[in-house]
């Protein structure tokens, strides 16, 4: 196509040319016309647009492929583009030409636009986009105003197109380039085009997307934007405001003579990032020190030394940054020992280091973000709501201006539409099966197919029906409706229809086979009853499938089978009752027999009531899985007021009583009672967000209470289970998703972790072109987060690019020998390492990746050829904490189970620390970043037990496996304590005083290491027993040089261990060998009655008791994690193993302590078995 640049250039055909004025005035031979002589008769507004259009830059119509006649006749008048042979003619003005289009007026504007751009593809011009999503329509309305048409969902017949001059104008809205760039960046971060995602959105998901934007906009206006309250300001996590320093820690610090190390540099050095030659001041440890008081002491010492910088302004403020990390301690009400980073250093016998930073320089990195750009789909949604006459916006405020957020939450239509309430219906639920499609039944004439229907709420089945058996080759039913024993007035608003399709042989009483299953809510996203005929795509009957998932298999994953059913219609829209109707019913109902219940105001009188013991007995019976009889359910229901005020966690029990959900009066009262319900525990709230509760009212209540209880310090521990809770949501718009979005926008670190965990989720769902409902929901949540945090997009983009490059390299080196692969890795890194430097670590943004150390990059020897990479830690004084950031990149392993175990370990660590027990756990970071792709933090200065075992030869390795003191000897060596022969040679050159000082320091270091080993052994013994971690051998047990013991590689959990000849290899409850006990006893032989081992046993029992007190929380966490569909966490038996190790049937702390004391004795007496396994492992792998 040749291009014309002059404003006077006209469209040209092969036989002649006419000006733009003629083109606008003429509509072709078959079109309606206005005067071709004068355009001045048009409306003045339109005349202005015509004149502006005439002055555009435009091309000629001479096309290389000869298709120019598509738009112009030989006479120079535009041909009609035919979309529909019997439609109306509409003129569409593009930025660079005009086209006349014959189309049906019933076509949606979005479809019209997409088809039009496909037809005019030969007319594309380089300076203009030919993507339909980059344009919106404008028209001249009845008031003579130029109006933008943002709602693409309406048909052309709804537009104000004048019969004498039907014309539409296409234009690119203001800011379209920024929107395009933003969409492109977000698409890159997601790994999937937003344009394609938009095309796949149905009406519910478009509403969800607009709601997410409204929440994003509201949150961004209210979150911290300045100073230390800035949403990205990295305050170090702390345990509890006002908490005193534990006495044990205080004694440990004083014995080790620890102090605070303060580092200061001049302003110019800080600006340039120079960390060498920093001034150091040591300040004596004070258990009551706060950041404010420590700074005050430091500045006082500086004045005494007469040290200052003339470049600093007189009013300069100061921050304390933890050495080696981008985290600060600034809260004046929090003691330093309550900060996690400070306490960990003290517990490890290390002096906490602080870099004193200038506030003015630090806060430059946390400036106010630029205003949000309102995306085009929001304006489209506002217009749609206005045209649909829907009344309430997302934030329940009336529309103030055309720029406000009109996004719907109250989905009820206006009175002009025919509608009734569910409570107006006087009928039972009726459903008709229609047919089964998309499934190839076995070619056997005797095959039948049938459907099982059930209506449920949570774990309760309210009604069920099984259809007649029909011939599988036809798989069609007659027009008979099946009537369910479910009165419509009593149908709960969150009732779910479960459909299961089965087939088998007619003449044989053999096992039936499952075609598939699907669960669908009986109400739609508008909160209206589903009516009419529906086609639902079934889920394949996979063994690990999440059968609680609500929604169809829209992506056709695993099967193309579908079922068509018809739900009885009532001649109009049927809406669910509102909260006001529930309240009215409860207040004015005429039957009061069940309202005379235990009120619960006086706790003492309640527990003395004879019915209380029966209540406790029934609760235990229910929790054991036994279904309560109706009279027993009534007894529990009579105690609802007591439960509301005294035992709010029993809401779980009430929500699982069939008695509640089969009568609208009962669940209406429960809804009303929730308004004044005492907050349940975190464990109970998480349980209510799992598969046991599908009711949206109760789930909303649980989210609200969870949001109140989880502080910013602890919220990150629950991101993973809350993501799984999303999978149990019946609708796209959920309170769980909104809470995750809000928290992520208000805390950069939460947002960073949420993004990567969500990206790993959608990576597993990216295996087909038709994206699943779950994929689209999560993608929209991620998009909303990135739109609200544009600054994070730049960081995420670099990290995504890093993952892509490492994936490419790991694939490249997979088939190579280890040494050759390492050389190839380093060659590749030399050309791209600059792309992976000077950025936040994907594992934890508090660490800054500096220069990559290419010579330390290696390919590990395992089958998947993981890559081990090292960077310099760019944070100041990183030598005190973590000089290098090392990580392993894995391509081909599913890291989700490891991440689950380590997340639970982090929760345990947090709970133990809150109970003043520091078990020195090392929950290193693991981050899945895609399908079978992820990175693992490398813990520095450590070795596996096997590496410690390996000596100078085969026999030496075998002997060390048997030698109970080899671990203790290794620890002594790391502390500088040599064996007697080596020691005598070295000491011969030193005087006696030097010898004594060196020996004292080495022994002090050794005993500190033994103490670390003791507490870490306590933590991992209890944790691995509770989680049933198996396949423990000397290659996945590690020891740091300072004595910390920890586990890696969690391939087998919840009792799933390796077996040989049907016998499990790991027969001990947890690892406790003679080698460990020798270290605990500081090298002395094992004696179970010794003070050291009795102390170890006591600590183990105390640590277990703390976990037992929180048993409900762990059961809730693992129950939610069923949504991950891991092979070893997928069944009730897996959860039963956890309940067994947590001694959930125990009724008292004494019983729990006695239970674990028995477990300890079993591990102690069976230590020889583990020792033998280690010997065979060493011999096999040497």
UniProtKB/Swiss-Prot annotation:
Keywords, comma-separated and alphabetical: ATP-binding, Kinase, Nucleotide-binding, Transferase
Activation loop as annotated region, ranges: 1047-1073
Positions with biased composition (Polar residues): 1-16
Domain C2 PI3K-type span(s) in chain numbering: 425-577
GO terms under cellular component: cytoplasm; non-motile cilium; phosphatidylinositol 3-kinase complex; plasma membrane
EC number(s) on file: 2.7.1.137
A Pfam family annotated for this UniProt entry: PI3Ka
Coiled-coil ranges from the UniProt annotation: none
GO molecular function: 1-phosphatidylinositol-3-kinase activity; 1-phosphatidylinositol-4-phosphate 3-kinase activity; ATP binding
EC category: transferase
Biological process per Gene Ontology, one example term: response to cadmium ion
Domain PI3K-RBD: 266-358
CDD domains: C2_PI3K_like, PI3Ka
Signal peptide: none
Residue numbers spanned by region Catalytic loop: 1028-1036
Reported effect, residue 842 to S: In hx546; increases lifespan. Increases dauer formation. Fails to avoid NaCl after exposure to NaCl under starvation conditions. Defective in aversive olfactory learning
Region (G-loop): 859-865
Protein name: Phosphatidylinositol 3-kinase age-1
Phylogenetic placement of the source organism: Eukaryota, Metazoa, Ecdysozoa, Nematoda, Chromadorea
Gene (UniProt): age-1
